[in-house]
Amino acid sequence: KRSAIVMQNTAIGVTINTLVTLIQYYNIPLPMLISYRGEIGEPVACQVEMAVHTKALLDQLNIPTYHFHTKSDADELDAILNHSFMAKKPVAILTDAGFWQGA
């Protein structure tokens, strides 16, 4: 069996220590499906602040990041998952509102 995690981008801040000290240090593959909150039209204002930092934090951690805007972007999912498990590294897949609304 293989693991993955589903979370909102606001959880990135509280998972940094675990990502660095466990996942990356021990070469544990971990696909992260992340609902990307805080873009234009976000109804909850506090979500916007974390959206400003999400991609920069993932970049600083050297975690490959993919951003799904439309359903057709999910065609890349198998390749992304295979890369995570082959390379034994975490990957982040950001999914914005357009993706979930079927754009």
Regions found by a protein language model. Give the residues of each.
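Thiamine diphosphate
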Residues: K1-R37
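Hydrophobic/aromatic beta-strand patches that form the interior of the parallel beta-sheet core
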Residues: A4, P31, Y66, V91-I93
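Fold-independent oxyanion-binding glycine-rich loops
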Residues: M7-N9, I34-Y36, L61, F68-K71, ...
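Glycine/aspartate-rich loop-and-adjacent alpha/beta segment that forms the canonical ThDP
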Residues: G13-T15, A87-A103
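Short, well-ordered, mixed-charge alpha-helical segments that flank or form enzyme active sites
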Residues: V14, E39-P43, A74-L77, W100-A103
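Active-site-proximal loop->helix
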Residues: T15-Y26, G41-Q60
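Residue-level signal for alpha-helix termini/capping positions
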Residues: Q24, F85-M86
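Conserved thiamine diphosphate
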Residues: C46-I80, M86
